[in-house]
A protein has these predicted regions:
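N-terminal charged helix/coil linker that caps or initiates catalytic domains
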Residues: 1-26
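Conserved SAM/SAH-binding loop
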Residues: 98-106
């Protein structure tokens, strides 16, 4: 696979590629954001990826999720993502968890073996538990804030959670993490105000029992995912130096 990453080596150097090949990154949530995180990490040569998601690919995912096609509908998202990654880099090691991350299942995940964690889940309890466990294990984590109901992909920023503005999810995260003694967290967020959708209050087809289906377009969650992956890559390379 040396030729596959030769252009990357020109930019990052051989030692950086070796570091990435030896790295293990866990991506929690393989959806519109997390799928693009995995895609970029795989194409940059990260050697071991943990894929965590309980969902299967739905028709309503096709508008924004890189793993979603008419051929993958019904497959576990982790299976579809694994197949795609191995088509990109057959040497990659994949660990799959076909489950939903919850505070009570946190013990099933080897946080002390991860070099980096990406939070791309969409429930507050899971996000808080992820950050808390990474903090306890001294593992770097980057979190995705709200990407739904937005149209401006140029509005995303990388910041400390304490410095975010205009993001309702970030506001709640900041308050809840402060209660847990955690005051700093790297996040990707947007200051674009959420756009009201016509079907507000209707059930979410991707998450039975949930209300307020968020609107989405292909060019917003994908950009957030690529930014998240870029931060992971840059941080892993810095840690190697």
């Amino acid at each position: 696979m040396e030729q596959a990453f030769s252009r990357t080596e020109l930019l990052l150097g051989s030692s950086a590629l070796e570091r990435l090949a030896a790295s293990r990154v866990a991506v929690f949530g393989i959806g519109g954001v997390g799928g693009y995180v995995c895609e970029a990490l795989a194409r940059t040569g990260v050697g071991h990826l943990d894929l965590i998601d309980s969902d299967t690919v739905a028709v309503s995912n096709i508008n924004r999720q890189i793993i979603a096609t008419t051929k993958t509908v019904g497959q576990y998202k982790t299976d579809a993502m694994e197949a795609r990654i191995l088509d990109i880099n057959p040497a990659a090691k994949i660990t799959k968890h076909n489950c939903f991350f919850l505070p009570e299942t946190a013990a099933d995940f080897p946080f002390n073996q991860y070099d980096y964690v990406v939070d791309a889940v969409d429930t507050m309890s899971a996000k808080l538990a992820l950050v808390t466990h990474c903090h306890a294990a001294d593992v770097p984590i980057i979190c995705a804030m709200g990407a739904g109901n937005k149209l401006d992909p140029t509005g995303f920023q990388v910041a400390d959670l304490a410095k975010t503005k205009m993001d309702p999810l970030a506001r709640v995260m900041r308050r809840e993490l402060k209660k847990r003694g955690i005051h700093h967290l790297k996040v990707v967020y947007s200051e674009e105000p959420p756009i009201p959708t016509a079907d507000a209050g209707q059930a979410d087809p991707d998450h039975p029992g949930h209300r307020n289906t968020p609107g989405s377009v292909a060019f917003v969650p994908s950009v957030m995912g690529l930014i998240l992956a870029g931060e992971v890559i840059k941080d892993l390379i810095k840690a190697e130096k």
